[in-house]
Amino acid sequence: MTRFKIVKDVFRSLEWNRRRNVLTGMIFVFLMCVVHSAPNALGREQAGGACEKRKGLVILVEFPDIAPAVDEAFVRDRFKKLDFYVREMSYGKVCTDVDITGWHRLPDSVKRYAISPANLQVDKSRVERLIRNAVNAADEKNDFLRYSFVVLFLGAAFKEYGMVGLCGYPGMLGWKEDVVLRTPKGQIVPGGVAIFTYQAHLGTLFHDIAHVWGGVRGGQRVLPCLYDHDIQARHPTSDAGFAEALINMGYWDPLSCHFYKRNIPPPGISSWTKLRLGWIPEEKVRVVDPKEESEVVLGPLEDGSSETLVIKIRLSESTYYLIENRQPIGNFDRHLPGKGVLIMYADDRIGECRHGASPVRLMNADPAVPYLQGAAFDPPGKELFVDKKNKIEIRIVERIGDSYRVRISNGKCVKP
């Protein structure tokens, strides 16, 4: 497949409603970017450098009672889009490539593998059986040591399987670091396993594969779901009010929302997620002392050329604030509920989003807007955040193009 065809496919997938003459010019520009191995101008500091490739094996799974609704070309296109997304989110540092097997028919009907759409109500034995049957079917013709993650791509629809996508490990089957899955030939299945129906959105693909890439550290998932699991149990799907579970990060990160709207690409990921994946260079993280006054020009998180991508205010060994700037630029942050400065409180002691607790949570600039869609701070009127307990004041002093000058006070003027 030519690079020109790849770029055309990417544009079509993102459903850009451009006029034909504008589109022609942009295809040429992006073609040149691809030819020179730079994902786009926003990640130009990575231009010329090789990306860290995440190689995956996609096992196509069919069931005896239903015919696959898609073909291999459809699946390949989905993962081509994932690569495009990952390159932009990592500023060109990381890319992904997959090998796709032929269709493997499992011994049981899809009903025997079907699960609940609510995470806390999933029959784990069914997930384990699906993974083992699919991996065993692919054992003979595939060398699993060549890959860092495995995907089961089902020829079934969401309503037939019960969940549009999930992470088997580290996820539904737990996240013990000593878990080892072996094939009948004795091959070790590396990394982890994600499962998707063919209707999975690009944001869902990233969400569950990111769980695998994050892995397990200190007995915790590095990248957990950022929606509340207990609320999701009561509102498991979009039709059942899934947005109610978005109490931590709203629609500002696909680890929380998967996507903002079904018919558009997912939003970009937050600085918290990028930091946990190791996708933000250390020199672009400005660490400030909350006891001293600091001013920082904060560039857009989507623009990898920004001198500062995130501000970190450490409160203790495990707690801190992150400040990022989200602007409608690039291919994905244009699909956000708003724009401005996001302020997040993080607590590394918290592993999962349960019972109202979360390892990261947005401070909400406008609580009157539901589902944290008004969380961004942006002048006029929403330029100040105050933490009275820790005596910290965060103020947007001015806007400079797409950047902001942000002042972090020492708290002397903040009354408890």
Which stretches of residues belong to each language-model region?
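Non-catalytic C-terminal accessory/binding modules of secreted extracellular proteins
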Residues: 47-49, 55-62, 67-73, 88-105, ...
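Surface-exposed acidic, glycine-flexible loop patches that form ligand/cofactor-binding
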Residues: 45-50, 123-150, 311-314
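Boundary at the C-terminal end of the N-terminal hydrophobic targeting segment
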Residues: 37-43
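Aromatic-lined ligand-binding clefts that engage carbohydrates, nucleic acids, or primary amines
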Residues: 153
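Divalent cation-coordinating acidic motifs and surrounding scaffolds
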Residues: 73-75, 79-134, 177-179, 199-200, ...
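N-terminal secretory signal peptides that target proteins for export/translocation
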Residues: 1-19
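Bacterial N-terminal signal peptides
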Residues: 24-34
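Extracellular hydrolytic enzyme modules, especially secreted metalloproteases
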Residues: 144, 156-332
